Structure formats: structure tokens, C-alpha cells
Amino acid sequence: MSFYGSRYFGDIVHGELGKDLFRYHGFVMMVAVAVLVFVMYMGCVILFTKFSYRHFLNRQRLEFWWTIVPMLMLVGLWXPSMINLYYMEEVKRPRWNFKAIGKQWYWSYEFCRNLDTPSSSESAESISCYTIDSYMEDQQETFSKGGYRLLDVDNRMVAPADVQMTAFVSSSDVLHSFALPKLLIKVDAIPGRINRLPMKASQCSIIYGQCSEICGVNHSFMPIVIEFIPEKYFVMWLEALN
């Protein structure tokens, strides 16, 4: 996660896909900077040169290359982008699911006590389900604990780290948006519709996010906090809910 006074972006905890997206971003920026420098250089040459070629009518070879080179650059950007998009949309078997429901102006999480493990033998009838309402924490209490202003909540959602899971996102009133930048996640919460979102945190962490869709007067006071803990402690947390 990011800290106050940090000079860099926060760490991405999305595993190998996050690293691939980070490398792709660096590649795109390298190409963009190279194109910008070349265009500025050619612009300066054309504007400030004292010479001109009066008999220049057309140059087929030049027109060929200034068409082919941008096409090759775009293809070079397209190929890794499509690969990353494919892996981002890849659906894997989840071991745990939870539902995030946006409400004015807090988040409600619904989940069941089952975690898909080789030793799990609970029947569907014996599985207990729970609901957690997560409101923004009072600022005085946040300051006393040294927390983050407008980002901490009274009840954190807890999830297992390094476990493939699925988040089902919806809304009970107006449009919201469930966004966790450190997990590379942003999905709309739409009334009457459930959006499916694969999720996996590669390490134990506390991930902060916010509603990213203007949803009313208290839109800015609708934080999201998910605490990812080791799987064995997560199982103990689920058992303690009973």
C-alpha cells in the first residue's frame, strides 16, 4: 500500500498479471516519449531551418515509410495489450466468493462461511451466511489510531491472501463503482445487475479503495477496505463468526 509522503505509486498486489501490466505501461511510455521527441525535433528542424527545397512535389518512398512505421508501432502495442486483456478476463475456478453491494453511502458485504478446500465436507444446508456493513470511520477515531483520513472504515472486509476468489458487485439504489487500485480492480455497481469480478491478492495486505462513481452528496465518504490475511487465519476468522 502507499504511505504519506511517498514518491512513487503504491505496490500492485495482483501477482504476475500486475507485473505484466506494469511492464506494458513502461513499454508504452517509452514508445510515447520516443515519438514525442522525434516529432518535436522534426518540428524544430522544419520551423527554424534556413533552407527549403522548392522543387519537392512528392516522395513515394517517404510516404511509404511514414505509413508503415506507425502501423508497425501500433501492432507492437496491440499484441501485448491483447494478451494482458485475455488474462485479465480469464475465468478461473474460485475457492471463495463474496458479494459487495453499494448503498448510499456505505458498502455491504455478503458472504458464506464455506471455503473450497480439499478437506471441506459441509453441505449446502449447513453453510452459514453473514453480512457486514462497512461505514466510513469517525475521523477522531481514525486520527487516534494513526489511520487514513476518509479511507478507514468501522468494519473491514476480510479475505484470504493468495486464494482465487470472485467478487459479485451490485447496488441497491443508484450507480456506484467498486474500485481497488492496488488490485487493478474497478467495476460498476448497477442496480438490478450483478457484475462478476475475479480477484486474487498475491500477498497479505490492507487494500484501500473508494467509490468511483458520483452517487450523491456523500460520494466522497464511501471508502472500501479489504484486509487480506493468510488462509489459515482466515479459516479461523470464519469459524469465530459463529
Curated annotation (Swiss-Prot):
It is found in: Mitochondrion inner membrane. The chain crosses the membrane at residues 31-47, 67-83. Disulfide bonds: none annotated. Residues 48-66 are mitochondrial matrix. Its main location: mitochondrion. Its EC number is 7.1.1.9. One of its GO terms (biological process) is ATP synthesis coupled electron transport. It catalyses: 4 Fe(II)-[cytochrome c] + O2 + 8 H(+)(in) = 4 Fe(III)-[cytochrome c] + 2 H2O + 4 H(+)(out). Cu cation A2 binds at residues 211, 213, 215, 219. It is an enzyme of class 7 (translocase). PROSITE patterns: COX2, COX2_CUA, COX2_TM. Cu cation A1 binds at residues 176, 211, 215, 222. Its cofactor is Cu cation. Component of the cytochrome c oxidase (complex IV, CIV), a multisubunit enzyme composed of a catalytic core of 3 subunits and several supernumerary subunits. The complex exists as a monomer or a dimer and forms supercomplexes (SCs) in the inner mitochondrial membrane with ubiquinol-cytochrome c oxidoreductase (cytochrome b-c1 complex, complex III, CIII). Belongs to the cytochrome c oxidase subunit 2 family. Component of the cytochrome c oxidase, the last enzyme in the mitochondrial electron transport chain which drives oxidative phosphorylation. The respiratory chain contains 3 multisubunit complexes succinate dehydrogenase (complex II, CII), ubiquinol-cytochrome c oxidoreductase (cytochrome b-c1 complex, complex III, CIII) and cytochrome c oxidase (complex IV, CIV), that cooperate to transfer electrons derived from NADH and succinate to molecular oxygen, creating an electrochemical gradient over the inner membrane that drives transmembrane transport and the ATP synthase. This is Cytochrome c oxidase subunit 2. It comes from Mytilus edulis.
